[in-house]
C-alpha cells in the first residue's frame, strides 16, 4: 500500500535523495541514509515493488555487480504527498484547504490556498 510505505522510516529521505541526485548505486544511497544495509535493501526492494523507484544491475565483471536505483515518475508523484502533508499540518483548524495539483509533462507543482471559512 502506497501510504503505508511512505510513512516508513527513511522512505522520504530516499525518494528525495534520488530526486535530487538522479540514479545512484546502493553504496551511494547507504552513505546518505544512516541505517543498516539490510534495512535499506529491504526498503529499496519495497519501493521497487510498488513502482516508486526502478532498479538495474550493472555487470562490470567484478565479483558483485552494482545495483543502481532511480526515481520513477510515480515516485515523483509520491513526493507530492509529502508536500500535501506539510500544507495540511501547517493549516489551522478553522480553515479549509484547497489544494490543486498540476502534473504537467515537465513539471510537478502543488498550489495550496488556505481559505478562512468565515470569509466565504
Curated annotation (Swiss-Prot):
UniProt superkingdom: Archaea
Entry-linked InterPro entries: Tscrpt_reg_PadR_N, WH-like_DNA-bd_sf, WH_DNA-bd_sf
Matches recorded under SUPFAM superfamilies: Winged helix' DNA-binding domain (SSF46785)
Similarity annotation: To M.jannaschii MJ0361.
Official protein name in the record: Uncharacterized protein MJ0944
Organism per entry: Methanocaldococcus jannaschii (strain ATCC 43067 / DSM 2661 / JAL-1 / JCM 10045 / NBRC 100440)
Amino acid at each position: 500500500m502506497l501510504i503505508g510505505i511512505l510513512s516508513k522510516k527513511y522512505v522520504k529521505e530516499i525518494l528525495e535523495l534520488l530526486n535530487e541526485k538522479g540514479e545512484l548505486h546502493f553504496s551511494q544511497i547507504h552513505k546518505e541514509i544512516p541505517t543498516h544495509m539490510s534495512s535499506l535493501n529491504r526498503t529499496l526492494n519495497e519501493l521497487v515493488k510498488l513502482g516508486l523507484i526502478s532498479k538495474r544491475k550493472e555487470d562490470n565483471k567484478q565479483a558483485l555487480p552494482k545495483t543502481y536505483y532511480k526515481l520513477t515518475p510515480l515516485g515523483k508523484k509520491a513526493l507530492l504527498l509529502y508536500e500535501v502533508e506539510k500544507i495540511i499540518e501547517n493549516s489551522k483548524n478553522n480553515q479549509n484547504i484547497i489544494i490543486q495539483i498540476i502534473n504537467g509533462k515537465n513539471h510537478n507543482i502543488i498550489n495550496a490556498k488556505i481559505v478562512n471559512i468565515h470569509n466565504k
